[in-house]
Amino acid sequence: MQLLKQLFKKKFVKEEHDKKTGQEGMTLLEVIIVLGIMGVVSAGVVTLAQRAIDSQIMTKAAQSLNSIQVALTQTYRGLGNYPATADATAASKLTSGLVSLGKISSDEAKNPFNGTNMNIFSFPRNAAANKAFAISVDGLTQAQCKTLITSVGDMFPYIAIKAGGAVALADLGDFENSAAAAETGVGVIKSIAPASKNLDLTNITHVEKLCKGTAPFGVAFGNS
């Protein structure tokens, strides 16, 4: 912007000189330079604004996932089971139920990437039904999938990725027995199962394969 101001200042001085000498107007080269600088500045502003928006969305996602996780464990862990969720409709009702109980706000229930409520599934742990839960964040681009997992993955002991659609109960397996295979880039990539090959960002293969496939992606973050 400072360079742009200097150019206009020089142009003003030149115009004053031109008036005295009978010459007027900006050269074509000067016009091209000014327009080029304006284009670069505008592109930079747009890029910075988009990065700021993306950062805010990721922060919101992390806060919402943490709030939901805390609400679920405080409300249901002592009861021994989480409410059964046979499908996405039931999973959506579990989310709405936490809102109606005042455990989370309606804003915390929303997926910040698409504005709809996140689904909460209950699934087995060591073959016992409804002993674990998974919060699904759907409708992600590949870039959003990767950034979300690397941003909030440490908050959860279980992570599963679905490529080409939303997470369903059948994608979750067993919290304790479904081994992770992070080298595949999809499916269960983090688990407490003994044979798990959990996501390791120091493993270049894991980094390259993460969120492999076609968007939209869904990511399930689980705990028990």
UniProtKB/Swiss-Prot annotation:
Described function: Major component of the toxin co-regulated pilus (tcp) which is a type IV pilus essential for bacterial aggregation and subsequent colonization in the host small intestine.
Entry keyword Transmembrane: yes
Disulfide links within the chain: C145-C211
Domain of life: Bacteria
Cellular component terms (Gene Ontology): extracellular organelle; membrane; pilus
One matching Pfam family: N_methyl
Protein's membrane topology: Single-pass membrane protein
PROSITE patterns: PROKAR_NTER_METHYL
Propeptide span(s): 1-25
Modification type N-methylmethionine: residues: M26
Keyword Hydrolase part of the UniProt annotation: no
Domain remarks in the Swiss-Prot or TrEMBL record: The leader sequence region and some other sequence particularities suggest that TcpA may represent a novel class of pilin, and imply the existence of a novel signal peptidase.
SUPFAM superfamilies in the record: Pili subunits
Keyword entries, A-Z: Disulfide bond, Fimbrium, Membrane, Methylation, Transmembrane, Transmembrane helix
Membrane spanning stretches: 26-46
Gene: tcpA
Subcellular location(s) of the protein: Fimbrium; Membrane
Name recorded for this polypeptide: Toxin coregulated pilin
